[in-house]
A protein has these predicted regions:
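Short, charged helix-capping/linker segments at alpha-helix termini
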Residues: 6-17, 27-46, 55-62, 148, ...
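Structural recognition of an alpha-helix C-terminal capping motif at a helix-to-coil junction
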Residues: 42-49, 62-74
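Short amphipathic alpha-helical boundary/capping segments
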Residues: 15-17, 111-120
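C-terminal edge and immediately downstream basic/flexible tail or linker adjoining helix-turn-helix-like DNA-binding
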Residues: 2-9, 13-15, 106, 142-143, ...
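A short pre-motif secondary-structure segment
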Residues: 126-130
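DNA-recognition helix of helix-turn-helix
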Residues: 73, 77, 144-168
Length: 170
């Protein structure tokens, strides 16, 4: 935003507008990362609390939405360390993502969620950001804090693992 309102009210309003534009996507990403709506809610709340407390820094970033997604990924990693195993209830529906090529090819989305949970955290984040959120390799690398080459290799390994896990389920 080029014009910034002064005072706390202005900061709150700017943050609200930002959150309105990114909240659904953050929530979907959080759910796809952890496989549980309640954990996703907590993850998004933690992410937004950190983003708000560092709002000026977030605004100065080249891509504020990428900065906040990076917070989300970091928070989810902390959660994975605490809870190594998450379960996905059968029949759980994933909201339709912006780019649904991969999800639409899977008969039961719960199976996709189960397969995602079988991936190591970094590979899961890469697949979610690249294919389910539709981000480029460059955007994904920026969010994950790694090179595009790392994104490519993590994606390749993840797709091989997903293919194996999904074949085992059929």
């Amino acid at each position: 935003m080029s014009h910034r309102a002064s005072g706390t009210h202005g900061v709150e309003q700017e943050f609200r507008v930002f959150v309105q534009g990114i909240a659904d996507s953050l929530h979907r990403t959080a759910y796809l990362l952890c496989g549980d709506w309640y954990l996703a809610d907590d993850l998004v709340q933690e992410t937004l609390a950190k983003a708000y407390s560092n709002w000026r820094k977030v605004q100065r970033a080249d891509s504020p939405s990428a900065y906040v997604r990076r917070i989300l990924i970091n928070e989810s990693r902390r959660g994975w360390r605490r809870n190594r195993k998450h379960t996905v209830e059968s029949g759980t529906r994933v909201p339709d993502p912006a780019v649904a090529d991969m999800a639409d090819s899977v008969v039961n989305r719960a199976e996709l969620l189960h397969a995602l949970q079988a991936l190591p955290a970094r590979q899961r984040a890469t697949v979610v950001l690249r294919f389910l959120e539709g981000l480029s390799e460059r955007e994904t690398a920026a969010i994950l804090g790694c090179s595009e080459g790392t994104v490519k290799s993590q994606t390749s390994r993840a797709l091989i693992k997903l293919k194996t896990v999904l074949k085992e389920e059929y």
